[in-house]
């Protein structure tokens, strides 16, 4: 028993050990049970965080959370906004970061090395992909019921829209002169309303004015025209008399960026808008 401290040492150490134990008792539960601090690193991540996370757990949103094309912008009012950097995320003491795309591709790994859990949203070209994204984020945030409620609302709108256009063909068109072929979320949205994209090929691609003049589409679905009018586009309908006439005669619906900009559950709002246009034609 030579290594056992004598009574005097134990008596002197007693108050210190009691104080230390009390400190751990006070701090440990707060550390273990503390609510997560959640940040969103870009505008698409904003939508998921704002819809799924409790407001008091959101440390900050992106600098684009209040933009006109941010679907959940009303929920972002009053929340801190920051550009996504290693310094801002660590400075916010974030425990969870949600990301779709950021200019710095190294940021997710840098955050993980610092102990931040990074939830990466996947590119979703259909509604199954959107369901998977909602469930992924909801699971990490421990908000599964909220996530399922979003999915249920989305699916109800899709069910109400099904087959509205009966297979009619339409060309999707943006102010920058792009259209959507197969394997795009826009094509999936059109298909959910009973439309077939008139664009050949796969993915998003430019369409020329000459093509529109020589082979005019029987119907148009416009996207982003409410949000992106102005000089940033290569061409616009407003700047061309032929296109103005074509749009006036053949536009089925004009969808805002707040329904198109991110692969999220509210894409079903755009589907429903297309379907309703078909129901009143």
Where are these regions (language model features)?
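Bacterial N-terminal signal peptides
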Residues: 15-28
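Structured C-terminal subdomain patch of bacterial secreted/periplasmic proteins
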Residues: 36-37, 128-139, 148, 165, ...
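A short, structured surface patch at a secondary-structure boundary
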Residues: 36-102, 201, 240
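Basic- and aromatic-lined ligand-binding clefts that recognize polyanionic substrates
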Residues: 36-49, 144-195
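Short secondary-structure boundary segments
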Residues: 42, 101, 202, 223-227, ...
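Alpha-helical, coiled-coil/dimerization segments enriched in small aliphatic residues
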Residues: 63-67, 75-78, 180-205
């Amino acid at each position: 028993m030579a290594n056992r401290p004598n009574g005097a040492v134990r008596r002197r150490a007693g108050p210190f050990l009691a104080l230390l134990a009390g400190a751990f008792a006070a701090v440990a539960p707060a550390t273990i049970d503390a609510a997560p601090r959640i940040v969103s690193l870009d505008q698409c991540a904003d939508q998921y965080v704002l819809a799924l996370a409790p407001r008091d757990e959101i440390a900050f949103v992106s600098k684009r959370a209040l933009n006109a094309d941010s679907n959940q912008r009303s929920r972002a009012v009053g929340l801190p906004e920051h550009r996504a950097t290693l310094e801002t995320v660590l400075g916010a003491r974030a425990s969870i970061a949600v990301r779709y795309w950021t200019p710095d591709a190294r940021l997710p790994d840098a955050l993980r090395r610092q102990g931040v859990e990074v939830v990466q949203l996947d590119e979703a070209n259909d509604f199954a992909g959107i369901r998977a994204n909602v469930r992924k984020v909801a699971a990490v945030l421990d908000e599964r019921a909220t996530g399922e409620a979003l999915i249920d609302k989305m699916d109800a709108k899709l069910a109400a829209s099904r087959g509205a256009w009966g297979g009619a063909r339409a060309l999707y068109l943006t102010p920058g002169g792009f259209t959507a072929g197969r394997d795009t979320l826009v094509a999936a949205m059109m298909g959910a309303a009973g439309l077939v994209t008139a664009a050949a090929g796969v993915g998003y691609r430019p369409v020329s004015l000459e093509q529109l003049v020589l082979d005019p589409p029987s119907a148009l679905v416009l996207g982003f025209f409410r949000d992106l009018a102005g000089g940033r586009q290569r061409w616009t309908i407003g700047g061309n008399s032929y296109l103005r006439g074509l749009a006036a005669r053949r536009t089925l619906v004009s969808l805002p960026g707040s329904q198109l900009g991110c692969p999220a559950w509210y894409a079903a709002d755009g589907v429903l808008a297309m379907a309703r246009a078909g129901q009143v034609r």
